[in-house]
From Swiss-Prot:
This is Apoptosis regulator Bcl-2 homolog. It comes from Murid herpesvirus 4. Interacts with host BECN1; this interaction inhibits host autophagy. Interacts with host BAK1 and BAX. Its main location: host cell. Keywords: Disulfide bond, Host cytoplasm, Host-virus interaction, Inhibition of host apoptosis by viral BCL2-like protein, Inhibition of host autophagy by virus, Modulation of host cell apoptosis by virus. InterPro entries: Apo_reg_M11 (IPR029450), Bcl-2-like_sf (IPR036834).
Length: 171
């Protein structure tokens, strides 16, 4: 098994990603290969936001207002019917949004730890590392439009308010 498919690698990668987007300077001990992969994921989330700016602006704020309580519901809804690279980039973009817009940038708090634990647990528990080969990361970036992601985002835009009102909706 490739080290990039191990839970330990992804736990390290998710932590480094969240610390990077939180602008925390504690990355001295992180392996350079992990930092290269973090850079790739950041590039993907930037591309994701360029393609889906209207959904990003309209839905993340209200949907993630109570992120501590409802983050796992959002992730479950995101992956309920299919797992693909576009949706996994959306997973990372949700974490990025929480770090940049909801939590205090430039620090690493208990809330950051909670976000890190939630994302890591969900990613590993659902074995997402076997659906997201980093070797193909930029190929996935160019295929955003063909992965059905536009449909997914429109569906999420409709169901997020219901998810966060306590109803579990399957897209």
């Amino acid at each position: 098994m490739s080290h990039k498919k191990s839970g330990t690698y992804w736990a390290t990668l998710i932590t480094a990603f969240l610390k990077t987007v939180s602008k925390v300077e504690e990355l001295d001990c992180v392996d350079s290969a992990v930092l290269v992969d973090v850079s790739k994921i950041i590039t993907l989330t930037q591309e994701f936001r360029r393609h889906y700016d209207s959904v990003y602006r309209a839905d993340y704020g209200p949907a993630l207002k109570n992120w501590k309580r409802d983050l796992s519901k959002l992730f479950t809804s995101l992956f309920v019917d299919v797992i693909n690279s576009g949706r996994i980039v959306g997973f990372f973009d949700v974490g990025r949004y929480v770090c940049e817009e909801v939590l205090c940038p430039g620090s690493w708090t208990e809330d950051h730890e909670l976000l890190n634990d939630c994302m890591t647990h969900f990613f590993i528990e659902n074995n997402l590392m076997n659906h997201f080969p980093l070797e193909d990361i930029f190929l996935a970036q160019r295929k955003f439009q063909t992965t059905g992601f536009t449909f997914l985002l429109h569906a999420l835009a409709k169901v997020l308010p219901r998810i966060y009102s306590g109803n579990v909706i399957y897209v």
